[in-house]
Amino acid sequence: ADLLAALKLDAQTMMAAILHDVMEDTPNTKDEITSRFGSDVAELVDGVSKLDQIQFRSRAEAQAESFRKMLLAMVRDIRVIMVKLADRTHNMRTLGAMPPAKRRTIARETLEIYAPIANRLGMHSIKRELEDLALKTLEPVAYRDLAERVAARREHRESVLKRLEE
């Protein structure tokens, strides 16, 4: 929800972000969500739940099928995709508790499916974070090397800027 708040999205989207797992993890139904939070929130929660139910037999199928289903969902309401991207970002931030094989699978899926969608939607900060977190999981040595080089260049840029300001 923090990511979506930073994007200054409406209250219904924020509520849907908080409630996005309710239909999957509790006995609450779409009708109950509608009666308590309104049809807009219920439709968003239902849309995210439907995306979560997609099952794939192969990575190629996953990419094609996910793009197709997400694009269809976007036609109805782009906020469904925004909630899903925020959820995936949160999941990537908290991968540590999962077994290594599961972490790698989720990281690959994130890199191949969700980061490109974030990019296409112009959500570049989310795209960058998803890519960083996926690389950190899939290629930890390369990630550390890259992070060190970026940090070194940042220090150099900051010192140049400081000299220019003086």
What spans do the regions from the language model cover?
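Active-site helical microenvironments for divalent-metal-assisted chemistry
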Residues: A1-E166
